[in-house]
């Protein structure tokens, strides 16, 4: 355990010298009789790129009309150090500032000598035209807009928070995000996996302490996977989940879960070679099995986790924009660890279970859970009616193996048998429903029902970025881009639950609807996702008059979507 503490401490110390945005760039403004000035004071070892410096008055670029100071040369780039003064004489202002209240926009990007590049920065100033003079306001970050206009998406605000706040506040906040995510369905697929692994390792020496230790190993490596995958994904410019959701990869991991299930049934055992077992036994009497727990924790985060939530997307946007992979990776690690806190309590609770013969039934139960997880993984690439058939068959076998035909004498055994009868009845219904083409788990015997949600909304399918860009700029109607994929579970939920709602269908009649299918994760799709700052479906982006107004990452209910898009 001590080594984990050392690793985390070293991880944190890496950021001791990193300046926050406020420390790196201090923007000021002043008004004079014949001019105004904008000053950018730079922190220690910070420099600005001259070709990234832009100044606008009422959306008109006046960068080429400003007398800039002499720049320094750094490699092949012209840069500014220490302080940059931008003087704007009244004669220039009178040419472009025709209104009483005008808007000045300043854009720049800077880096530090340590190799860190900050987000491109945008600052705004109000320019008031008075008789024979101009007055400039103090700088502010967010452009003032009508209350009905929604500019910043949730993940963008999180990315900006990463870029501007204190390092330890960032980690604490992302730990809080993780705790909130633990209250959502994101964590549910992890529970049966961890529980079955712990039960599989049970023996006479099984204890609360050891159970908690196994849970910690699982959560630690799950968190490590999120951090590593996030950093790699940012460098690739696409979601690592998109790569790992290829059909061949999904089939491979489904086979792994099937293998674990048969191991639960006692068909075979996973064991290290004898030489390694002897080495581990010498190091720790309880060491055997920890490697397997760690591997499953790592893989569970990459494959089983169904959510690409706003905190994750926000961290990825920050990493991609700045190259600060360590800070973004740390935030992802802490967020994932917070998300795994309930798993630690589950492991601790399993430690109170006393082993005995009845545990064999528990292992069989979790074996079927593993098979259910394998089917769930394959549901991303197989038609829904075939998935119903598979679950129906699994339910029948589960009822038999768990003792539906055994005699019942006690109240507990009778309750158990009643539950198994209900499971058997439901399993037969979804099996028959699947045979006749049904796709709804809640209404499997309604054979004539065809999901209206898939046909209620009319979409155009465009995957080419240039075509999307042209459509956004030229279309007179508001536009909704729907980033989706065949393997995306939450995308299916959006279609089945949110976009089947009559209120949403009615509201969407005012929009041009475009689906962007990123199932294949090819170069064109990766480019499109990168251009729109999308790190994994589902993502909904709303445009109006060629400008992005709202971005939603992950599943959203019909009620919540209406609140966001209604004026």
From Swiss-Prot:
Gene3D superfamilies: Glutaredoxin, Thiol:disulfide interchange protein DsbD, N-terminal domain
GO molecular function: electron transfer activity; protein-disulfide reductase [NAD(P)H] activity
InterPro entries, A to Z: Cyt_c_assmbl_TM_dom, DsbD_gamma, DsbDN, DsbDN_sf, Thiol_diS_interchange_DbsD, Thioredoxin-like_sf, Thioredoxin_domain
PANTHER family the record matches: THIOL:DISULFIDE INTERCHANGE PROTEIN DSBD (PTHR32234:SF0)
Disulfide bond residue pairs: 111-117, 186-307, 488-491
Organism phylogeny: Bacteria, Pseudomonadati, Campylobacterota, Epsilonproteobacteria, Campylobacterales
Domain Thioredoxin: from-to ranges: 430-567
Compartments reported by the entry: Cell inner membrane
Top EC class, one word: oxidoreductase
Residue ranges, Cytoplasmic side: 188-211, 269-289, 354-361, 407-417
One GO CC term, this protein: plasma membrane
Annotated membrane topology: Multi-pass membrane protein
Entry keyword annotation includes Flavoprotein: no
The keyword Transferase is assigned to this record: no
EC number: 1.8.1.8
BP-aspect Gene Ontology terms: cell redox homeostasis; cytochrome complex assembly
Family: Belongs to the thioredoxin family. DsbD subfamily.
Catalysed reactions, as listed in the record: [protein]-dithiol + NAD(+) = [protein]-disulfide + NADH + H(+); [protein]-dithiol + NADP(+) = [protein]-disulfide + NADPH + H(+)
PROSITE patterns, A to Z: THIOREDOXIN_2 (PS51352)
Entry-linked CDD domains: DsbDgamma (cd02953)
Gene name of the encoded protein: dsbD
The entry's keywords: Cell inner membrane, Cell membrane, Cytochrome c-type biogenesis, Disulfide bond, Electron transport, Membrane, NAD, Oxidoreductase, Redox-active center, Signal, Transmembrane, Transmembrane helix, Transport
NCBIfam families linked to this entry: PRK00293.1
Signal peptide limits: 1-16
Record-given protein name: Thiol:disulfide interchange protein DsbD
Residue intervals on the Periplasmic side: 17-166, 233-247, 311-332, 383-385, 439-567
């Amino acid at each position: 355990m001590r080594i984990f503490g050392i690793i985390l401490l070293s991880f944190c110390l890496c950021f001791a010298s990193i300046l926050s945005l406020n420390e790196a760039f201090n923007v000021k403004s002043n008004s004079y009789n014949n001019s105004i000035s904008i000053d950018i004071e730079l922190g220690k070892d910070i420099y600005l790129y001259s070709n990234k410096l832009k100044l606008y008055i009422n959306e008109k670029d006046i960068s080429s009309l400003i007398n800039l100071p002499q720049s320094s040369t750094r490699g092949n780039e012209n840069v500014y150090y220490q302080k940059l003064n931008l003087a704007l004489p009244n004669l220039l202002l009178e040419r472009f500032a025709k209104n009483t209240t005008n808007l000045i926009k300043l854009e720049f990007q800077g880096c530090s000598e340590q190799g860190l590049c900050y987000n491109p920065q945008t600052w705004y100033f109000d320019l008031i035209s008075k008789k024979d003079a101009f007055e400039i306001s103090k700088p502010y970050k967010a452009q003032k807009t009508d209350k009905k206009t929604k500019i910043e998406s949730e993940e963008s605000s999180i990315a900006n928070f990463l870029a501007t706040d204190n390092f330890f506040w960032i980690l604490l906040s992302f730990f809080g995000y993780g705790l909130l995510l633990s209250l959502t369905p994101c964590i549910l697929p992890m529970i049966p996996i961890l529980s079955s692994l712990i039960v599989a390792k049970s023996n006479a020496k099984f204890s609360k302490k050891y159970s908690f230790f196994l849970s910690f190993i699982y959560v630690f490596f799950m968190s490590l996977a999120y951090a590593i995958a996030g950093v790699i994904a940012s460098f690739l410019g696409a979601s690592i989940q998109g790569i790992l959701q290829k059909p061949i990869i999904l089939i491979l991991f489904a086979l792994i879960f099937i293998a674990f299930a048969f191991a639960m049934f006692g068909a075979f055992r996973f064991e290290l070679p004898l030489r390694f077992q002897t080495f581990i036994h010498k190091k720790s009497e309880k060491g055997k099995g920890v490697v397997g727990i760690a591997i499953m924790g790592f893989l569970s985060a990459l494959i089983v986790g169904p959510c690409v939530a706003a905190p994750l997307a926000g961290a990825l946007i920050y990493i991609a924009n700045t190259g600060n992979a360590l800070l973004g990776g740390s935030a992802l690690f802490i967020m994932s660890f917070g998300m795994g806190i309930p798993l630690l309590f589950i492991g601790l609770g399993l430690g109170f279970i006393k082993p005995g013969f009845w545990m064999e039934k528990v292992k069989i139960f979790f074996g079927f859970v593993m098979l259910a997880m394998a089917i769930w993984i394959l549901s991303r690439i197989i038609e829904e009616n075939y998935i119903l058939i598979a679950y129906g068959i699994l339910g029948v076998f589960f009822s038999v193996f768990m003792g539906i035909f055994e005699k019942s004498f006690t109240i507990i055994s009778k309750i158990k048998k009643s539950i198994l009868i209900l499971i058997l009845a439901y399993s037969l219904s979804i099996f028959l429903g699947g045979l006749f083409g049904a796709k709804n788990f809640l209404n499997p015997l309604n054979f004539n029902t065809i999901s209206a949600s898939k046909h209620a909304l009319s979409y155009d399918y465009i995957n080419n970025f240039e075509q999307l860009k042209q459509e956004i700029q030229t279309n007179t109607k508001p536009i909704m881009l729907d980033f989706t994929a065949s393997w995306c579970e939450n995308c299916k939920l959006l279609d089945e639950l949110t976009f089947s709602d009559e209120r949403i269908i009615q509201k969407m009649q005012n929009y041009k609807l475009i689906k962007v299918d990123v199932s294949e994760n090819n170069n064109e799709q990766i480019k499109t996702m990168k251009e729109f700052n999308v790190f994994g479906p589902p993502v909904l982006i709303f445009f109006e008059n060629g400008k992005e107004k709202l971005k939603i990452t992950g599943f959203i209910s019909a009620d919540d979507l209406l609140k966001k898009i209604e004026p």
